[in-house]
Structure formats: C-alpha cells, structure tokens
Amino acid sequence: MATVIPGDLSEVRDTQKAPSGKRKRGESKPRKNFPCQLCDKAFNSVEKLKVHSFSHTGERPYKCTHQDCTKAFVSKYKLQRHMATHSPEKTHKCNYCEKMFHRKDHLKNHLHTHDPNKETFKCEECGKSYNTKLGFKRHLALHAATSGDLTCKVCLQTFESTGVLLEHLKSHAGKSSGGVKEKKHQCEHCERRFYTRKDVRRHMVVHTGRKDFLCQYCAQRFGRKDHLTRHMKKSHNQELLKVKTEPVDFLDPFTCNMSVPIKDELLPVMSLPSSELLSKPFTNTLQLNLYNTPFQSMQSSGSTHQMITTLPLGMTCPIDMDTVHPSHHLAFKCPFSSTSYAISIPEKEQPLKGEIESYLMELQGGAPSSSQDSQASSSKLGLEPQSGSPDDGAGDLSLSKSSISISDPLNTPALDFSQLFNFIPLNGPPYNPLSVGSLGMSYSQDEAHSSVSQLPTQTQDLQDPANTVGLGSLHSLSAAFTSSLSSSTTLPRFHQAFQ
C-alpha cells in the first residue's frame, strides 16, 4: 500500500474538483470521494485529505511565528486558533464566573464545570481534571507514551508513535466506559446521535429547513439561536458595541412614574350600561354634570329632566375622589360663560383640571351665539362646603350664589337663560328641537316663572349624602329677574342676564 505524497495530491486535485460553496436546502451531504490510501477513512475534499495525510507522515507545515514558541500544526485554521493564545486580550468570557479565555473551545470546555450533570475525569497521576472523555484519554495516552507504553486504553491496540495513538483515540469518542454519558438519542432522519432530546430537536432544523431566528441588522435568518449569536458577533460586532456604549435615554416625565388610580376605578364601571349606572349607588363618589355636546337625547313631555353624571366623552360614570386625593376638600366654580363645571383642585390634581378646562374652552368656542350685540358681565357661582348642622353630611356641597350687583334695569329681550336651563333639572315643557343649534330652550312667562320658583326644591342629591358629594339647593333668584319675564320672546342667554 503506497503512501500519499504531496505530488500525488496535486494530481488528484487536477482530476477531481471538490464541490465548492454552501449546500442548498434539500440537498444531501456531499459524497466522500477522496479516500485515504493508508486507512479506511474518506473525505469530501482534497484539503481535508491533505490535512489527514499529515497524521500519517507526521508533517506539520504550519509553524507558529511567535518568539519562544516551537509549536506547529497540520492546518492553517489550527495555527490561527493557536495564535489567539499569544494575544493579551481574552475575548471569550464565562457568564457564570467571569473567567476569560482566548479561544471559544476553551470556554466551551470550561462551561462543563458549571453543569451539575457533567462528570469530570481526574488523572490519578498528576491530579489534572478533564470534562470530556476524549481529553482525558488523550492525557492518559501522553502519560503512557512518556513511559513507553503506546497502547490504547480502550481497545488495547498498540501504535508506533504518540501522534498515531492520539489520532486513534478520536475513534473512541462516542463509546462509553465507566459511567460516561452515552449518546442514546438518535435522529429519525439521519444516523446522528445526541446526548439529550433537546439536542435532537435543535438538530431537526437541518432537515425541516425552518429558520425562526432573524438578524435585526441584515434580515438574515437562522435555524438555531446560537448560530444567530455567532453571526451577530462575527458580522455585526460594531453595531453591538454601539448598543452597549450608548447611554440609557431618560424617559419623558409625562410617561415616567405616572400612576393613574382613576383608570383602575373606571374600568369596571365603564362596562356597565347607563341605566345601571344611574340606579346603582356608588360610595364616596362625586356627581358632576359635564356636557360634551348640545345633541343630547331629551325625554318626552311630562317626564323629569334628570341630571346625570357624564364625562367629557359622553360616558356616564362616577369619579372616585378618594382615589385622587382623599385629604383635600374640593371647591367648584361655575362661570356663566360655560355650560359645565370646572374643578378647582390642589396642585397634585392640576393635570385633571387642565384637561377639563381645555375641554370647556373648546366647547364654548364651538357654540354659536344667539345675540351678538349684547355684552356679558363676569359673574360666578361657587360650590362651597356648608357649615350648617351635622345632619346635612360632612361631604355635601351646596351651590351658593355670589354677590350680584345689578346696575341697569333688566331688559327682557336682552335676557337669555337657556344656558342655565340646560344644566338645571326642571319639570318643564318638551324640548324644542329648533333651538338645538343655539343651546337654548323656549318657555312661556308662566312656565318660566313657576320653574324658577321651584328651583330650590327640584335640585336633589343623586347619591347618599353620607357617602357622596352632591349638588346643594340653589338660592332663590332676584325678584327683579322673575318679574321682568315676557311671554312673547325666547329666553336669552344665561351669561347675559346680569348686565
């Protein structure tokens, strides 16, 4: 049997070309058409056959160029891997003990020490430990070769040199002896065997072709997560360094540390129908009437106009004020230029106040004016806590009228109380649809006079005064106001009442 020499390999290279490039999906493994003439091994490329031939001849053409290093290797890849050990920088780090390594395979071998299921092999002669059976047997072969024994400890076969013995030990890598783990799990599609079922499932992507791991930098897909990690470290190392060195952006103050307890209280209530909300008592709640649009459904003649609790979006819902701030009393102010209440809350509740005020300004600006030649004076109504007897309830609020000075005689055509009657519950006549655009309602003199006289008795608290904060009774209006009403004109705007 002839020995393979470099000259023979050049002839083989010319006659048969090895397949180049990566294997496409669905293609079978390339056939090993290059057998070794000294052993029964075969290879799929001339380069691999050449590297293997060095194990028979003992030649190591790739020598280390570092000073005071005499090591040589059979392939250029192994030389490059060895050169990393001379570099002062260790790029491979253990995530468990922070230990650094020059080579990735050294780190991989070190990780076995952190695996409780892995068994270590300790040499009895020198005390050195190994994590793999192959490494341990190679170490024993070195001790045996030093003493002159070149016998394999597995099959008891004798070899002529230490290098040949070490090459032979690779054939025993999958065999078990003395409690060493065995590859019991075989792939259903090929002959490969694995230690665990997890390794088999990870290997199955080779046959299924699934690539579920996407690179976020180049959109390349991989079948295994470790392959994606290896690709990102190799091809996108600069991008990863930028991500690690970039400072953490400070979040917007409006999105940081913002707790919204009202939202949690409203979620179970918003899912209820409006009829259930009106009939269901809620403890420790505040009833407000915030109108968002003039096109609200009105009841038929003879029915009572109820004051319902609405939000700016038209949803009927009680607001739990204890959740917002339980230790402060609220003061309500209602300017005549608006149809809704604005909430005056302490500093911690300013965001809620700003939202309601901005909504009211939009509503006021969008409403058309019925009389443009008249002017409105600034008058305010306040909701202040009553200081009466304890029977009235500690949390009740009453609607008190501030001091009003009437400088001019009241002119009936210039008066408009439609805004007032839009948010005060009255037992009045049916709603006039022709006055929807101007937010107004028409009443005769008798009806308006009787309605105004009934104001202190019609307004009632919607909830239990012991647990809720309701709207108090209205003070009686001025006699000059009630005596000047006319039956032939539509009631003017409310904010123009007191000129």
UniProtKB/Swiss-Prot annotation:
Sumoylated with SUMO1; which inhibits transcriptional activity, but does not affect nuclear localization. Blockers of sumoylation pathway such as SENP3 and inactive UBE2I increases transcriptional capacity. Sumoylation is increased in the presence of PIAS1. Acetylated by lysine acetyltransferase EP300; which activates transcriptional capacity. Lysine residues that are sumoylated also seem to be target for acetylation. A motif (Nuclear localization signal) lies at residues 22-25. GO terms for cellular component: centrosome; cytosol; nuclear speck. There is a cross-link at K244, K263 (Glycyl lysine isopeptide (Lys-Gly) (interchain with G-Cter in SUMO)). Residues 2-84 are annotated as: Interaction with KPNA2. A zinc finger (C2H2-type) spans 34-56, 62-86, 92-114, 121-143, 150-172, 185-207, 213-236. Keywords: Acetylation, Activator, DNA-binding, Isopeptide bond, Metal-binding, Nucleus, Proto-oncogene, Repeat, Transcription, Transcription regulation, Ubl conjugation, Zinc, Zinc-finger. Disulfide bonds: none annotated. Residues 41-242 are annotated as: Decreased nuclear import with localization in the nucleus but also in the cytoplasm. Residues 243-383 are annotated as: Repression domain. GO terms for biological process: gland morphogenesis; multicellular organism growth; negative regulation of gene expression; organ growth; positive regulation of gene expression; positive regulation of glial cell proliferation; positive regulation of transcription by RNA polymerase II; prostate gland growth. Residues 1-33, 364-400 are annotated as: Disordered. Expressed in heart, spleen, lung, kidney, brain, testis and epididymis but not in salivary glands. Residues 384-499 are annotated as: Massively activates transcription. It is found in: Nucleus. Residues 369-379 have a biased composition (Low complexity). Transcription factor whose activation results in up-regulation of target genes, such as IGFII, leading to uncontrolled cell proliferation: when overexpressed in cultured cells, higher proliferation rate and transformation are observed. Other target genes such as CRLF1, CRABP2, CRIP2, PIGF are strongly induced in cells with PLAG1 induction. Proto-oncogene whose ectopic expression can trigger the development of pleomorphic adenomas of the salivary gland and lipoblastomas. Cooperates with CBFB-MYH11. PANTHER family: PLAG1 LIKE ZINC FINGER 1, PR DOMAIN ZINC FINGER PROTEIN. Interacts with KPNA2, which escorts protein to the nucleus via interaction with nuclear localization signal. Interacts with E3 SUMO-protein ligase PIAS1, PIAS2 and PIAS4. This is Zinc finger protein PLAG1. It comes from Rattus norvegicus (Rat). The lineage of its organism: Eukaryota, Metazoa, Chordata, Craniata, Vertebrata.
